[in-house]
């Protein structure tokens, strides 16, 4: 195996393992966030049964659906996240060679910054093309609030994918893809671009204290998450459309979804669950730092 292939494989494994561990740890926060985001577009949650906020959601989930339901959809998320994060990190370095070849970070700061933004955004968009159906299934499984098998919309990951594919075809599994690409480019650009730029400005980027790394990563994930959050809300709402027919369809398209949320629920609705997203972002920050630490030993 060539050095290049070995380096790619190390990136793939380090990124994937770090991501799988952190995602499972923050899965309950992720599910609360998703429910708050999509409950207005759910056929299972009537207006009077909607969650009032994070605390109400955290209290009611174990009571109504059982404690383990906090991890509903987590298998899809781990399966999805392993290739997503691993491909992101692996492609990030390939894209960095394209966008940053021969750029001096101290003498050409803005070109260096722009190159980092471009490489981070391109890496995120590329990997999304491969794993979007898993992202879709993760959202639909997390939004499924039925308690027993009879009340559930889907029995599991395979059932969700096959049911929607039979109903809507491949298009159904890629519902909301366009707005996802927009959001992911904005998020990843900040996530990787600002993180790498900040680390690159330090005197000795190769030997940064783990606490400093974590603090930089924490700030980056919180800011990136909030900036791209409205795009995430719209894409999740669009995902909830798949499998619906006729009068059940809430939004005719992405633009209609943006308009209706703003008109019917107000601008605040775009940020429903955003606070839990900041908490979940701690897991994202942990991934960046853990990835750097794992790479030192492989």
From Swiss-Prot:
Keyword Mitochondrion: yes
Region (Important for transport activity): 235-240
Matches recorded under Pfam families: Mito_carr (PF00153)
Solcar repeats: 6-98, 111-201, 212-297
Binding site for ADP: 80, 92, 235
Catalysed reactions, semicolon-separated: ADP(in) + ATP(out) = ADP(out) + ATP(in); H(+)(in) = H(+)(out)
N6,N6,N6-trimethyllysine: modified positions: 52
Presence of keyword Mitochondrion: yes
Compartments in which it is found: Mitochondrion inner membrane; Membrane
Signal peptide: none
Function, in words: ADP:ATP antiporter that mediates import of ADP into the mitochondrial matrix for ATP synthesis, and export of ATP out to fuel the cell. Cycles between the cytoplasmic-open state (c-state) and the matrix-open state (m-state): operates by the alternating access mechanism with a single substrate-binding site intermittently exposed to either the cytosolic (c-state) or matrix (m-state) side of the inner mitochondrial membrane. In addition to its ADP:ATP antiporter activity, also involved in mitochondrial uncoupling and mitochondrial permeability transition pore (mPTP) activity.
Protein name per UniProt: ADP/ATP translocase 1
Source organism per UniProt: Oryctolagus cuniculus
């Amino acid at each position: 195996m060539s050095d290049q292939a070995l380096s790619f494989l190390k990136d793939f494994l380090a990124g994937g393992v770090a991501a799988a561990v952190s995602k499972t740890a923050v899965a309950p926060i992720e599910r609360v966030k998703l429910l708050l985001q999509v409950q207005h577009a759910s056929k299972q949650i009537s207006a009077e049964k909607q969650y009032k906020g994070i605390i109400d959601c955290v209290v009611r989930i174990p009571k109504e659906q059982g404690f383990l339901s906090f991890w509903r959809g987590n298998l899809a998320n781990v399966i999805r996240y392993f290739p997503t994060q691993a491909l992101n990190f692996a492609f990030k370095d390939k894209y960095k060679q394209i966008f940053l070849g021969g750029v001096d970070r101290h003498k050409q700061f803005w070109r260096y910054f722009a190159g980092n933004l471009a490489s981070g955004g391109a890496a995120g968009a590329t990997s999304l093309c491969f794993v979007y159906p898993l992202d879709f299934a993760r959202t639909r499984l997390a939004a499924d609030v039925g308690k027993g098998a009879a009340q559930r919309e889907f029995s599991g990951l395979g059932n969700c994918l096959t049911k929607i594919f039979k109903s809507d075809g491949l298009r159904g599994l890629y519902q909301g893809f366009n707005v996802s690409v927009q959001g992911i480019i904005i998020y990843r650009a900040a996530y990787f671009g600002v993180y790498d730029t900040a680390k690159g400005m330090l005197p000795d980027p190769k030997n940064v204290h783990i606490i400093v790394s974590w603090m930089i990563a924490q700030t980056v994930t919180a800011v990136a998450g909030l900036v791209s959050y409205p795009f995430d809300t719209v894409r999740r709402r669009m995902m909830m459309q798949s499998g619906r027919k006729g009068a059940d369809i809430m939004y005719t398209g992405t633009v209609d979804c943006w308009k209706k949320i703003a008109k019917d629920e107000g601008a605040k609705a775009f940020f429903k669950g955003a606070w839990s997203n900041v908490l979940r972002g701690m897991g994202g920050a942990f991934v960046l730092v853990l990835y750097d630490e794992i790479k030192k030993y492989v």
